[in-house]
Amino acid sequence: MILQSWHESAFFDTSVSPLAGPPVAAYFLNLRVNQMSSRLDETAVIAALKTLQGWQLARDDEQRPAIEKDYSFTSFNAAFAFMGRVALTAERANHHPELLNRYRRVLVRWTSHSEGGVTALDLELAATCDKLAIDSGLKAQDSSK
């Protein structure tokens, strides 16, 4: 099947990326795939967020601590490409964010359900999202919260 062939090549051949920009695998150099860490306390999360521009402490739908950022792109296609690249990254890390698309805007929210809050992996994936956003057509003036 075409879909199966694409799926296999996208996840096992790290030189293949179905979306524009560098291969998604380029963002895994420092990512500890499948290594969930312990939940961080709120003070540690707030301190770590100072190194991530535009990310904020939030709550998910079940009121667990989370981190989120609202990105603004140059077009709907750029926003959707970003979401695709985040999805590939999340699948590879076996850790999935909440994504909400509103035309040229994408809200990304990370939390670790199994740990009941934010972990170091969430923070690392947030930093990866920032890199993916730049490569996907992020507006010069990011409309972060």
Predicted regions and their residues:
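Leucine-biased recognition of intrinsically disordered, low-complexity hydrophobic segments
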Residues: L3, L19, L29-L31
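Glyoxalase I/VOC metalloenzyme domain signal
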Residues: P23-A25, T128
